[in-house]
């Protein structure tokens, strides 16, 4: 579309409500428009990647994104990857989102249990002591037998 059309707020809002990834084609000012980005991440959390940098640090926006797609945690700002509630919401939606969490949270027993309960293969992203924990490994292999490969030696 021509640049003026990609800057047409009403038109772009209509587009992102139908496909969050349409945010990729929006004008720079619209990628910084909170309502626009919220509409996009409600459709697909991973659309957060196309938001202006300051909005990737917006807790409410990022939380909406990870609730829709756990792996959208990848696109959230660094401090949000260390936010326990944020990471818990992400791993509840997709256990493999654990890979994008701040290192200290990969050692959080409750959080890792939630992640491996959702997807056993998330065990590969857990801190080493949890990979050696029988109870944690059992939880992971009950969800996916192949998770055994990620248990500590």
PLM region descriptions:
Residues 1-153:
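Thr-biased low-complexity repeat/linker tracts and other Thr-enriched repetitive architectures
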């Amino acid at each position: 579309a021509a640049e003026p059309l990609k800057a047409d707020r009403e038109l772009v809002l209509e587009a992102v409500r139908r496909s969050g990834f349409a945010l990729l084609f929006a004008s720079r000012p619209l990628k910084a428009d909170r309502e626009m980005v919220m509409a996009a991440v409600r459709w697909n959390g991973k659309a957060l990647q196309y938001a202006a940098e300051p909005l990737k640090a917006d807790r409410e926006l990022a939380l909406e994104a990870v609730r829709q797609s756990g792996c959208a945690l990848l696109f959230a700002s660094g401090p949000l990857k260390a936010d326990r509630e944020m990471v818990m919401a992400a791993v509840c939606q997709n256990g493999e989102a654990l890979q994008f969490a701040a290192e200290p949270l990969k050692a959080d027993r409750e959080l890792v249990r939630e992640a491996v309960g959702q997807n056993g293969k998330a065990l590969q992203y857990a801190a080493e002591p949890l990979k050696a924990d029988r109870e944690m490994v059992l939880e992971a292999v009950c969800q996916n037998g192949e998770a055994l490969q990620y248990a500590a030696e």
